């Protein structure tokens, strides 16, 4: 299928870039937490949580707001996507991922408070990791759905056609 219309192409590129931003940030933040939190001192844990929240605010929070917005604009522009069953699954997984992402942020705030107060953090750590892993699995699944339905392939084709 050949997409026409400049706005749809901009939406497609923006959607693709935001998805990559969120996925890349999620992988980096999860790796940072899993590789260093248990080994860190109390001050190190506080610093790590502040850094994770800061980077999450600047990347994942923005992506989790604008990705659905741009997706809705794409669907408004090309309503035939509402007839594609894979798209319904993609939207469902994306909305669940956004909800669990926000839940993981709440757990991270509780974890930060527990570290500051000196309370046990093991249960909160497990809950945070569980939420983050589910979000990561849903994000990868959503990207896989896009690849399987030629969304990313057409995005790559569009970008390469503009470059040369």
Annotate the PLM regions.
Residues 2-164:
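Polytopic transmembrane helical bundles with strong interfacial aromatic enrichment
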């Amino acid at each position: 299928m050949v997409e026409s219309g400049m706005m749809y192409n901009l939406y497609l590129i923006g959607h693709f870039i935001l998805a990559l931003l969120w996925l890349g940030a999620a992988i980096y933040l999860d790796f940072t937490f899993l590789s260093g939190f248990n080994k860190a001192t109390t001050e190190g844990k506080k610093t790590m949580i502040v850094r994770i929240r800061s980077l999450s605010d600047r990347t994942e929070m923005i992506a989790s707001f604008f990705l659905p917005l741009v997706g809705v604009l794409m669907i408004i522009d090309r309503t035939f996507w509402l007839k594609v069953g894979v798209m319904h699954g993609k939207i469902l997984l994306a909305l669940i991922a956004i909800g669990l992402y926000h839940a993981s942020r709440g757990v991270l705030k509780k974890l930060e408070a527990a570290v500051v107060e000196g309370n046990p953090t093991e249960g909160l750590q497990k809950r945070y990791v569980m939420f983050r892993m589910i979000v990561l699995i849903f994000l990868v699944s959503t990207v896989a759905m896009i690849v399987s339905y030629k969304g990313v392939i057409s995005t790559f084709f569009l970008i390469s056609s503009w470059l040369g």
